[in-house]
């Protein structure tokens, strides 16, 4: 079981991003891309994700579709039930032409904000833009839930 690790205390105005991926290298890469702009926490499996959700409400979760102990779609549902304002971006190492379209559609239907492929088109600007858009939506969701 991978441990949950929290980043430094969130600074005012920084969004809280939770990276959930069983590949340490992918978590390291995403942290490197995002840590200058966001408060980053990490989880390496489904159990660590559940533990993380007990301690904090992330604004955005980057969630791998395939974890050793959990299905990404099931985790998506758990996240949205626990923290409805949180936006979830699904991650997959599967090529986009290998049947990923069907589970991508299921993820969007289940409340996912978006999808990032961990393939060759994976780029820093794409990750930053997707997370920024998801954070804006999460903040709007929070305001709506608070009645404002």
Where are these regions (language model features)?
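Active-site residues of response regulator receiver
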Residues: 64, 92
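Acidic catalytic/metal-coordinating carboxylates
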Residues: 45, 71-74
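Alpha4 helix (beta4-alpha4-beta5 surface) of REC/receiver domains from two-component response regulators
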Residues: 74, 95-129
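Non-catalytic signal-transmission and effector/linker regions of two-component phosphorelay proteins
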Residues: 1-18, 125-148
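Two-component/phosphorelay signaling modules centered on CheY-like receiver
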Residues: 24-41
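Short amphipathic alpha-helix used as the core "switch/output" element in two-component signaling
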Residues: 51, 73-85, 106
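Residue-level signal for the "D+5" position in two-component response regulator receiver
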Residues: 42, 67-70
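Acidic, metal-coordinating helix/loop segments flanking the phosphotransfer/catalytic sites
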Residues: 42-60
């Amino acid at each position: 079981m991978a441990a949950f690790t929290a980043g430094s205390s969130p600074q005012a105005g920084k969004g809280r991003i939770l990276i959930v991926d069983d590949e340490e290298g992918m978590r390291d890469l995403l942290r490197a891309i995002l840590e200058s702009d966001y408060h980053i926490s990490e989880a390496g499996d489904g159990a660590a994700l559940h533990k993380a959700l007990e301690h904090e409400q992330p604004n955005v979760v980057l969630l791998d579709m395939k974890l050793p102990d959990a299905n990404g779609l099931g985790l998506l549902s758990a996240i949205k039930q626990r923290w409805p304002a949180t936006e979830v971006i699904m991650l997959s190492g599967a090529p986009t032409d290998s049947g990923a379209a069907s589970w991508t559609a299921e993820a969007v239907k289940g409340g996912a904000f978006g999808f990032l492929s961990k393939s060759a088109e994976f780029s820093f600007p794409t990750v930053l833009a997707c997370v920024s858009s998801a954070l804006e939506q999460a903040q709007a969701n929070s305001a709506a839930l608070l009645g404002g």
